[in-house]
């Protein structure tokens, strides 16, 4: 409920107001929330190297996302004035993602199989979304017509992000603490830089690549601590 039903729904609401780039910037803060939850409630401890790596990962992600797109490539969704609501929704999505990881950790540590855990999470989320849709709430209804392209893109997103991505996160929680998993999973905005190069037919700005290098250095410190 926290990670997928609330987290993803609120993230898409933020994306409608801020666009994908700025939403990615806010969503990356879930690594900070994950570290705080792990340290405060699960008695997790990070070494000095891991803490330094965490700061490098977070700073590198912010740098990569903030400068990951040139002004001429600004998404049409970013040209609106709903910043306050979008920022609040983006931070709420990040917190929900961290809470989802936090709640899953005890079950994974107890030996729950990752595919089963992922299926349970998606099943509960699907049921909750169905009930919300059946409620007739205006915001739960589509405002436009569905197209085959739209449905295909959504299905691909669900397969890659939820089917594969969330299962791998559950697997990671079996072998690492919440703080480490949260930090490493925040790298997704950096990993998308080569994809932007392919799609936009132009390389991201140099500062974005510097952010990517900083994040990779931080990842090495976290993993090899």
Model regions and ranges:
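Juxtamembrane boundary at the C-terminal end of a transmembrane helix
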Residues: 171-175, 220-225
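Interfacial helix-capping/hinge residues at the ends of transmembrane alpha-helices
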Residues: 11-12, 23, 31, 38, ...
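Loop-to-transmembrane alpha-helix entry segments
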Residues: 27, 34, 38-63, 67-72, ...
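Membrane-interface interhelical linkers
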Residues: 1, 8-18, 66-89, 110, ...
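Hydrophobic residues within alpha-helical transmembrane segments
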Residues: 29-32, 48-55, 88, 92, ...
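Juxtamembrane helix-loop-helix junctions in multi-pass membrane proteins
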Residues: 19, 96-125, 180-183
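Hydrophobic/small/kink-forming positions within alpha-helical transmembrane segments
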Residues: 1-5, 31-36, 58, 62, ...
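Hydrophobic/aromatic residues within transmembrane alpha-helices
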Residues: 14, 40-46, 107, 117, ...
């Amino acid at each position: 409920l926290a990670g997928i039903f609330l987290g993803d729904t609120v993230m898409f609401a933020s994306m409608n107001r801020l666009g994908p780039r700025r939403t990615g910037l806010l969503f990356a803060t879930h690594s900070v929330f994950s570290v705080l939850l792990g340290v405060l409630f699960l008695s997790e401890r990070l070494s000095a190297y891991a803490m330094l790596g965490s700061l490098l990962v977070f700073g590198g992600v912010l740098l990569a996302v903030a400068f990951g797109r040139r002004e001429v490539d600004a998404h049409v969704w970013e040209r609106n004035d709903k910043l306050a609501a979008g920022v609040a929704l983006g931070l709420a999505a990040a917190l929900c993602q961290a809470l989802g990881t936090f709640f899953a950790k005890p079950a994974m540590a107890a030996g729950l199989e990752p595919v089963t855990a992922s299926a349970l999470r998606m099943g509960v989320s699907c049921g909750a979304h169905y009930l919300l849709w059946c409620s007739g709430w205006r915001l739960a209804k589509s405002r436009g017509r569905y197209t085959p392209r739209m449905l295909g893109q959504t299905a691909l997103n669900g397969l890659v992000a939820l089917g594969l991505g969330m299962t791998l996160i559950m697997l990671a929680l079996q072998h690492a603490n919440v703080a480490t998993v949260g930090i490493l999973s925040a790298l997704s905005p950096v990993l998308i830089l080569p994809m932007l190069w392919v799609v936009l037919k132009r390389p991201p700005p140099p500062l974005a690549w510097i952010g990517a290098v900083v994040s990779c250095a931080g990842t090495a410190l976290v993993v090899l601590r």
